[in-house]
């Protein structure tokens, strides 16, 4: 999980979602998981 000021899609499979008011990226590749914070 990477914590970043700006989250971006890193590949075609990445999905930008909102959970509990946080913007997150979920992906089949675990290296691409990101959270805004």
UniProtKB/Swiss-Prot annotation:
The keyword Metal-binding does not apply. One of its GO terms (biological process) is translation. It comes from the Bacteria. The keyword Ribonucleoprotein applies. Keywords: Ribonucleoprotein, Ribosomal protein. Belongs to the bacterial ribosomal protein bL36 family. HAMAP family: Ribosomal_bL36 (MF_00251). This is Large ribosomal subunit protein bL36. The gene is rpmJ.
């Amino acid at each position: 999980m990477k914590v970043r000021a700006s989250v971006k899609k890193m590949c075609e499979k990445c999905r930008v979602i909102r959970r509990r008011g946080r913007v997150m990226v979920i992906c089949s590749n675990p290296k691409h998981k990101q959270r805004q914070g």
